[in-house]
Amino acid sequence: MYAIISVGNRQYKVTQDQEFLTEKTGKNAGESFDAKVLLFAESNNKVHIGQPELKTARVSLKVLEDVKGDKIHGYVYKRRKNYQKAWGHRQQLQKVKVVSLSAV
């Protein structure tokens, strides 16, 4: 059984007890929440397609921990003007676990 859910601005294909990284959701570590938008679910070879989303299916998620993504470096310069600027960024992420998955 698997489902396609939308968390934040991204879509994820998830199964029972799967852990994945997502953008920061505003929840603290240890808190549980439901995926608000469920787009697709498959169970026992039956396919449920949302138009645009499923109302009967439910996916419960639990935030395990807050993590940071890989460092991204950037560099800007202007030739012959003695102007240069370096910057870096680390995306705030959360590790999330699928607690329960019900299709109907």
UniProtKB/Swiss-Prot annotation:
Indicate the segments annotated as coiled coil, or none if absent: none
Gene Ontology cellular component annotations, sorted alphabetically:
cytoplasm; ribonucleoprotein complex; ribosome
This protein is called Large ribosomal subunit protein bL21
- State the species of origin: Leptospira interrogans serogroup Icterohaemorrhagiae serovar Lai (strain 56601)
User: Which GO terms of the molecular function aspect are on file?
Assistant: rRNA binding; structural constituent of ribosome
Q: Does the keyword rRNA-binding apply?
A: yes
Q: Which family does it belong to?
A: Belongs to the bacterial ribosomal protein bL21 family.
Tell me how this protein assembles: Part of the 50S ribosomal subunit. Contacts protein L20.
